[in-house]
Structure formats: structure tokens, C-alpha cells
Amino acid sequence: MHFTEIINQLPQLKIFKDNTYNIQISYRYQKFNEEIPILFLHGFNGNSKSWAYQFHYFKGRRSVIAIDAPGFGQSDPSDLDMLSISNIVYNLLKSIDVTKCDLVGHSMGGMLAQIVASKHSKLINKVILSCTHKGYAMPVGSSLRDPYKLRLEERKQMSNKEFGQLRIQKM
């Protein structure tokens, strides 16, 4: 099946309003059965569409949820820290009656997955991390390291295509 067809089969975006943090978070939810669902957290510059192949593969097998992190997809931009975002993930899952999930995080989503799993461990059945690391053990509230500041600045100034081409050159 062609990628365009797979994208077109994605579940529609839904919006969760977190009143604790006053933020709207977009997400996709493909409910299949009452088994433990799989929650996917995307990497930097990704969104819930990043998991299109996983939605396609698990259709008819498992329930799948993919959340757009703040500032990605249709989620409100925010400067919230990862602990706060992990609480939003927890609140969103509670709002859709998910009491346990298998958690998959890629890159930045993997860093978030580690925090979700450590702070909301009763919610997590399994954790799978892809292309992530534990961070640099920097104190909460520390400024980002220079390479990440530069990447964020480049992202603000470029179109999706320009930024994608730049990132490919740097791989």
C-alpha cells in the first residue's frame, strides 16, 4: 500500500483540553478492543502522523494512540517542562479511560516516555525506547545545550521542506 493511502486511513485528530495546564493537545486514537493499547510518542519535528505505519499494522489487532506533543501537530505551543507534559499525557489517557498501556517513545518521545513511566508507573505495562537517551542529567530548568537551541532557531525560520533538507544533510 502506498504511503499516501496509509496517511489517509489515519484516525481523525481529536482534541484534549487539559484544564490543569490550560493547553489543548491533539491526538489520534484507533480503538480496536479492550486489550492494553499502545501509546506512541513522536520525536522532535514529528507528530502523530509519524506513526502512520504503526496505525496501519495494528489495525484490527490492537488499539493505538498517538499524541502530538505541545507545539507539534495541532497541539498548542508551550514552554512546559517534560514533567508537566508527562502529567498531560497521564490526564489525556485518564480522559479516554485508559488505565494501562504499552508505551513506545522515539527520540524526544523516548525521553518523555521515560518520565511518564517513572512518574506514572501504574499506567505503564511495557516501555519501548527508540533512538533516545537518558539526557545529560541537567537540573530541571537548565537552559538547553547550544546545538538544540540552534536547531530550534533554525526550525522557527525555515519551512518544513527547508528544515527537512537541512536535517538530512546533517545526518
Features from the language model and the residues they span:
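Helix-loop "lid/cap" segments that line or gate small-molecule binding pockets
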Residues: 150-155, 164-171
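Conserved catalytic-core motifs of eukaryotic protein kinase domains, centered on the activation segment
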Residues: 50-52, 75-80, 138-141
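Active-site loop/oxyanion-hole signature of alpha/beta-hydrolase fold enzymes
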Residues: 18-21, 28, 65-104
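Short, hydrophobic alpha-helix immediately C-terminal to the catalytic nucleophile
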Residues: 52, 90, 114-118
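Flexible "cap/lid" loop of the alpha/beta hydrolase fold
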Residues: 114, 118-119, 125-157
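Gly/Ala-rich beta-loop-alpha elbow adjacent to hydrolase catalytic centers
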Residues: 105, 109, 113
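Alpha/beta-hydrolase fold catalytic core
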Residues: 1-38, 61-62, 99, 129, ...
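Conserved HGGG/HGGXW glycine-rich cap/lid loop of the alpha/beta-hydrolase fold
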Residues: 23-74
